[in-house]
């Protein structure tokens, strides 16, 4: 079992416990389905020469503890002040030391739209994402089959959530080429080996002829990396570790 399989198995196990504490019907009763707020996450990225989705995360399996004095609200305010277009907040608890409360807290102070960064494997998590104030969710192609991708993306649309479908290779990219409303994210980190190569985004961008917003994720450490990607018509970047450590600017 690789680390991705381990995280997914753990997510499923914890989700069953969560459903016992608060069943789906209870969760749904807290969402006003007749007055759903529309997301502006996608709009915040479109039409700019350079858009940064700035990520808030305390730790990761590859880097270990990233931020010792972790303050998600202060970090969100910092990101907004330097001109980030949107935020990404890790909510996975065991491997990234995230929490949905971080997203809730940031939502109260930040005007930026927020991506809930987690390992979504169940409709429950999508309803929960709407309830806690997320504007966008992440759907990872490698952990979802085609039926799940279709079901989850349709539910996101119904809830007025934008969604990023994350791919890692050409085969996954081919699976999602007809998702015209999706933001396409290319993770430069192999989630099975955790090796990073930003050329992965360049390679897959050449294969992708659709008009979706295209995001390069992971391994972007300098403006030079961004400039290299922009030469290949990639203008949206999700940056986490280097921003959290204060190494980027």
Locations of regions flagged by a protein language model:
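Catalytic cores of alpha/beta
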Residues: 121-133, 169-180, 216-239, 248
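Active-site mouth loops of central-metabolism enzymes
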Residues: 53-71, 112-121, 162-166, 215-220
């Amino acid at each position: 079992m690789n680390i991705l399989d381990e995280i997914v198995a753990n997510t499923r196990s914890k989700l069953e416990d969560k459903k016992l504490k608060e069943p789906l019907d209870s969760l749904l009763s807290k969402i006003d389905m007749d007055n759903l707020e529309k997301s502006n996450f996608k709009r915040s990225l479109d039409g700019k020469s350079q858009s940064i989705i700035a990520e808030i995360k305390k730790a990761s399996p590859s880097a270990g503890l990233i931020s010792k004095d972790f303050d998600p609200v202060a970090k969100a305010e910092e990101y907004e002040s330097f001109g980030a277009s949107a935020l990404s907040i890790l909510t996975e608890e065991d491997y990234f030391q995230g929490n949905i409360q971080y997203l809730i807290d940031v939502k109260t102070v930040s005007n930026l739209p927020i991506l809930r960064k987690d390992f979504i494997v169940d409709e429950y998590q999508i309803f929960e994402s709407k309830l806690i104030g997320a504007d966008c969710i992440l759907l990872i192609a490698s952990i979802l089959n085609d039926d799940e991708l279709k079901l989850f993306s349709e539910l996101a649309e119904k809830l007025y959530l934008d969604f990023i479908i994350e791919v890692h290779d050409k085969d996954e990219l081919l699976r999602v080429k007809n998702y015209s409303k999706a933001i396409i994210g290319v993770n430069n980190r192999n989630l099975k080996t955790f090796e990073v190569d930003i050329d992965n985004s360049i390679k897959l961008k050449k294969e992708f002829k659709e008009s979706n917003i295209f995001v390069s994720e992971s391994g972007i450490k300098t403006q030079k990396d961004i400039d290299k990607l922009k030469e290949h018509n990639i203008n949206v970047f999700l940056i986490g570790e280097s921003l959290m450590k204060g190494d980027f600017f």
